[in-house]
Amino acid sequence: MGELRSSVAESFSLTQGGPLYRLQLRFGHAQEERARILRRALFAMVVAWVPLLVLSTINGSAYGTQLQIPFLHDFAVNVRFLVALPILILAESSIDRKWRLLVLHFLRSGLVQEPELPSFEAVIRRVTRLRDSVLPEAIIAAVAYSSFLFGAHTEALMGSASNWHAPGLGSSLGLSLAGWWFNIISAPFFRFLLLRWMWRMFLWALFLWHVSKIGLRLVATHTDLAAGLGFLSLGQKRFSPIVFAGGAVVASQVGNAIAYDGATLAGMKFVLIGYGVFAILLLVAPLLVTTPTLIKAKAQAVLSYGALVTSHNQSFATKWVDGYAPQGDEILGNHDPSSLIDLGSSFQVV
């Protein structure tokens, strides 16, 4: 049987869709060429970071000793918009390509057989419709702006320390122009991109969950120890830049707390441990949705392979242990011990 092909699977994407993508497409900024991706990342940095630098320089809070936290000394803000923000954009292309390859591998590996192809394509179309829906990104945007709308303007502040965000006050009162830009434009924009990645991860997990229900041709003796689904871990590894971006933001905020607010590294251990646990769960969770299917495949294989191994072992024992081997047959050089070991090894994999 030849390799299955599907134009629906070949066009699979979790990043090339949604209201913001369509807006970028209209202005010619959504193409996947490397130069255009770099321009998108640079444009995002220009919008989020450059105005903060210009406005804080104008009011004298970009550098110097008159403030405890001048703009250029604020680890959290600079790491967020000069390191994490471009990563969230630059990672889109490589992660999306890897996801597409994994989707196609379901067909190339024979996990999806021809009778299940329509169901497989239906799952892709369902996930694509969710990706293109306006409502999810609208909710993400609302959440991203919620802290500003409800008056929580303290994201860049460190206790009562004077800073570029609200010089001399250390509160949300009397925000500088740079502080207003941060709260209205920069911070919500970053949160939107980060939350949109969480949405994409949910879509990927949803795809895997639905696909695991369509009747995959799983092989319990597969040497990847996951019945042939071990390749899915490659997609989670490719997601590591997003985890790194989040980790950089957390680390920079911890740096601010230690440098300017008198915190200690030991005192911040729960923050660091908490993010570490969250990052692990984020990487592992999409794979966990296949667990019920794998458990079912294992249970079925234990019975079927167990019966086969039992029958083979009984025949081997009858022939070679009980002494019923044909006249002239010798165990040395015979294929029976080899088949016994091979079948036993397969059962151990199960």
PLM features: what roles do these ranges have?
Residues 1-218:
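Transmembrane-helix bundle segments that line or gate the permeation/cavity pathway
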Residues 39-50, 237-248, 275:
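Alpha-helical bilayer-embedded segments of polytopic membrane proteins, i.e.
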Residues 104-123, 163-171, 205-232, 291-329, ...:
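Juxtamembrane inter-helical linkers in multi-pass membrane proteins
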Residues 224-242, 263-273:
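Membrane-water interface at loop-to-transmembrane-helix junctions
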